[in-house]
Amino acid sequence: MDRWIAATHGAELRRSTDPVAVDLGYGAAPWTPVELLTRLRTAAPRTRVVGVEIDPARVAAARPYEREGLAFRHGGFEVPVQGSPSLIRAANVLRQYDEEQVADVWQRLCARLAPAGPGSRGGLLVEGTCDEIGRRHVWVALGPEGPRTVTFATRL
């Protein structure tokens, strides 16, 4: 998922004056925000990543991993970052919600994204799920205007 984001959204991140990516619901350990920062900085070196987690204990445990370009915040779908992020990634988060709730959450998250402008399609929400070891993935990419793509990926 991260490689796809860097490849398809890297130019948009480079164009942004303050490229912020949010890893929403990173889980028990902070590895996914750390990996996201590494991947995105190959495409857009000024990108900052904010890991957002609903569990305060997980945020506290992640704080020792903070460094230039990487921060952790307590929160949820309100996305507690200043401004409008260029990217929100929510992996394995919405699969625990009822299907009827997903469209409202997508709309809420897309409302937080950077708006489209001259030469810009605006921010990107990438929401999806994978198996336990990350070999099979599916995700949808949405912008402020609505769905853009759906991707199925597998590693054999």
Sequence positions of predicted segments:
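Local beta-strand N-terminus motif with an aromatic residue
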Residues: 18, 84-86, 90, 122
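A short SAM/SAH-binding and catalytic strip from SAM-dependent methyltransferases
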Residues: 85-103
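Class I (Rossmann-like) S-adenosyl-L-methionine-dependent methyltransferase catalytic domain
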Residues: 1-24, 28-67, 74-79, 118-156
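A short glycine-rich, Lys/Arg-flanked "PGG" loop and its adjoining helix->strand segment in the class I
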Residues: 95, 103-123
